[in-house]
Amino acid sequence: MELQHINVKLFLDSSPSLDLWEVVPIFHSWIQTQIWDELLIDVADYRHVPAGPGIVLVGHEADYSVDNSENRLGLRYNRKTKVSGTNPDRLCQALSAALKACERLEADDRLKGQIRFGRSELKVSVNDRLLVPNFQSSYESIEPEIKFFFADLLHGTDFVLSREDNPRNLFG
């Protein structure tokens, strides 16, 4: 099973005072300087949506957002175009992109140190219900590959994989 359109979300450690609007000029500066090897296009404000996407940096290859989906603030990387290579290659690409964005936000002086993303928990999902439906059979088919990827990445540190059972949700 080929994983494409991988999403990675890293959650905020704690920033109850963070006003998501403060992220808008930062995302605009990322567009102006084209800091990534991706085409970044626009910024959208969805703060009015409860438990929603928050502030979204729209790109051609991927979107970045500081979102509040599931009522948990975090940074979400949403890959939209295909990535070549193996499933571990694609997982690595998505995780690397999400971590780089987190590090850049954490280091941005305009946020005055208000933002810190945890590294001990993350959510990985596949935004393609046709390629990877959220069924137990999908999980069983790719679980060994995902376990191997994270075991290698974490150098033997214990970790727990879990899957959302609701077939209406994305696989993850």
Positions of the model-derived regions?
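Intrinsically disordered, low-complexity regulatory segments enriched in Ser/Thr/Pro
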Residues: 61-89
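Long, hydrophobic, amphipathic alpha-helical segments used as structural scaffolds
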Residues: 35-38, 102-113, 154-157, 161
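Ampiphathic alpha-helical segments that act as solvent-exposed interaction surfaces
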Residues: 22-30, 83-109
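Short, low-complexity, polybasic intrinsically disordered segments
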Residues: 133-155
